[in-house]
Amino acid sequence: MSIKMKYNLGYLFDLLVVITNKDLKVRYKSSMLGYLWSVANPLLFAMIYYFIFKLVMRVQIPNYTVFLITGLFPWQWFASSATNSLFSFIANAQIIKKTVFPRSVIPLSNVMMEGLHFLCTIPVIVVFLFVYGMTPSLSWVWGIPLIAIGQVIFTFGVSIIFSTLNLFFRDLERFVSLGIMLMFYCTPILYASDMIPEKFSWIITYNPLASMILSWRDLFMNGTLNYEYISILYFTGIILTVVGLSIFNKLKYRFAEIL
């Protein structure tokens, strides 16, 4: 395989499709519901949170079901990608040892697979919009790809860092699980950002995940694109990707011996 072929965009795209397809088949092998789990899982969590926060705690947020799922569904994409990335290189150890290819495609394929699951949840959002007397906006046509690309960049940056470092520090899994749980509650998914006291507003200001969630929510519920939030998402994502690829390129030569 020539160097030119290795880094040809067409080759990389085909490789990404093949690995993503393989991961999908492995995940849903012998599964009765198959891809429906990609919708059922976040929808179940949404029902639980709706019961707790709307019916028990009586949070006063209009159209709370739509509010909840427009934050929870994109969060699920990020959280699942970040968590699964920890073992993406380990799960593909045999391919890494026996085949020469750009290994950074492996965590990227995981991000894309979870992104496909997220796309499967958009019809659910549409249904609930109609239930609450709301309608999708024409701005979705360009807004969804714009924010989705930003989330891919951001999530890939996080994933390449986690997947690389986890080969050398296996305790990282526990820290990541705790970190994701902490960030879930520090991100305005279950509550509105204006419910946070002024002295804690920095939690939103310096949290790029908040920008990501609020970007999706503004688009889905209001049909608007908040370019400030989207810019933060892209800026942070590019920084994380650059840092992640730097770590990956420095350590990738030791992958075979570690695996």
Swiss-Prot record:
<feature type="transmembrane region" description="Helical">
    <location>
        <begin position="33"/>
        <end position="53"/>
    </location>
</feature>
<keyword id="KW-1003">Cell membrane</keyword>
<protein>
    <recommendedName>
        <fullName>O-antigen export system permease protein RfbA</fullName>
    </recommendedName>
</protein>
<dbReference type="InterPro" id="IPR047817">
    <property type="entry name" value="ABC2_TM_bact-type"/>
</dbReference>
<dbReference type="GO" id="GO:0015774">
    <property type="term" value="P:polysaccharide transport"/>
</dbReference>
<keyword id="KW-0762">Sugar transport</keyword>
<feature type="transmembrane region" description="Helical">
    <location>
        <begin position="111"/>
        <end position="131"/>
    </location>
</feature>
<keyword id="KW-0625">Polysaccharide transport</keyword>
<dbReference type="GO" id="GO:0015920">
    <property type="term" value="P:lipopolysaccharide transport"/>
</dbReference>
<keyword id="KW-0997">Cell inner membrane</keyword>
<feature type="transmembrane region" description="Helical">
    <location>
        <begin position="73"/>
        <end position="95"/>
    </location>
</feature>
<keyword id="KW-0812">Transmembrane</keyword>
<dbReference type="GO" id="GO:0140359">
    <property type="term" value="F:ABC-type transporter activity"/>
</dbReference>
<keyword id="KW-0813">Transport</keyword>
<feature type="transmembrane region" description="Helical">
    <location>
        <begin position="228"/>
        <end position="248"/>
    </location>
</feature>
<keyword id="KW-1133">Transmembrane helix</keyword>
<comment type="similarity">
    <text>Belongs to the ABC-2 integral membrane protein family.</text>
</comment>
<feature type="domain" description="ABC transmembrane type-2">
    <location>
        <begin position="33"/>
        <end position="251"/>
    </location>
</feature>
<keyword id="KW-0472">Membrane</keyword>
<comment type="function">
    <text>May form an ATP-driven O-antigen export apparatus, in association with RfbB.</text>
</comment>
<dbReference type="InterPro" id="IPR013525">
    <property type="entry name" value="ABC2_TM"/>
</dbReference>
<feature type="transmembrane region" description="Helical">
    <location>
        <begin position="176"/>
        <end position="196"/>
    </location>
</feature>
<feature type="transmembrane region" description="Helical">
    <location>
        <begin position="142"/>
        <end position="162"/>
    </location>
</feature>
<dbReference type="GO" id="GO:0005886">
    <property type="term" value="C:plasma membrane"/>
</dbReference>
<dbReference type="Pfam" id="PF01061">
    <property type="entry name" value="ABC2_membrane"/>
</dbReference>
